[in-house]
Amino acid sequence: MFTSVSAVCVTGLSTLSMDIYSRTGFIIIMLLIEFGGLGIITFVSFYIALPAKKVSIVNRKLIRDFFIDDIEYRPRRILKRILTYTLIIQLIGFILLMCGLYLAKDENFIFNALFISISAFCNAGFSTMNNSLSGFAGNKYILSVIMILIILGGIGFAVITNLVQKIKSFFYTKKEYISVHTKIVILMTLFLIITGAVYNFIFEFNYAFNNLPLPQKILNSLFQSITLRTAGFETLPQNKFAPPSTLLHIVFMFIGGSSGSIAGGVKTTTVFIAFLYAFNGDEEANAVIYKKRQISAQIVNKSITIISRSFIILFCSIFLLALAENVKLTNGTFSSIDIIFECTSAFATVGLSRGITGELNFAAKIIIILTMFIGRTGVFAMALKINKSKNSLNTVSYPKETVMVG
């Protein structure tokens, strides 16, 4: 059950070694990953396509804003576009990986290429190999293909659509503009990738990357920066990284991918809006200005609320897991940072672990399962809850009161 939930939630955590699974088992996991990766977005598209009597206008607008950055929204067309992009990207990834694995003399290069292509694009982190991708730590070609698949799966279909339309506009008279959403996603994605890669290279040079030649240190620094935010593949064991690096990795996992994507976490755009408001926002208007565009108070409030609630849920998960594994924490089998890392990885549907997943007791496994499920569906559910709460508040007026804060 643990592996099934992990696959559907596109997390990648597993309590069992991957070499115990048969070909049939891997096919089932692969289908669960594909279903889990596209399931929510497909469900949302059908949800919005329902008659207005079954879905309120407010909820319809909310889900549009949350998943699709499109002015003229047509659910069936968007769904068709999502499935088309997914098929094309995964097919190209499959062909490229098949060539790479063939040259690497992998006996099962066809099936492994298909499995890893789907897992990478869906940001699942599952691999048919026992030690994830550690066998390809020095293979620039294979890791580069996987990194591109992870990024494409993590930026969101709205961004891919916007960029494709922009490229098409160069060949037609119709002009297409890059949306503010796309600009924020690209900015945050590049910032997190570059920052993480530079940090890993400098501070893990003589630690996790100590035995690697210089080219592989650069390659694995970049790969670690990309995979740790949501994908969960690893070329090196996570318990080899120094504690300061692990803490930074936890922050990156919590941020995750971008809104409207297959990735987990609170999302890059959410963090960007909250950060912009904290340091450059109009407190009275409760809004922020970016690229000469005003981002509404509703989006600002939603961002802050999602981060706050996610942090509370994650803290509860960490506390419960610590209680469940109190004996192992006391005798030194687990460390506090192991528990925090495991819960954050589950909540952000990353799938990386410091080697404790297989040693968790029954209660701890249930906690991780619930954390994965909440992390996969929770942000969307929280957005709906926030919207409903605001609607109920708008119908009643209460006296205002002042409270000192800070």
Segments (PLM) and residue ranges:
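Membrane-proximal intracellular helices of multi-pass ion channels
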Residues: F2-G406
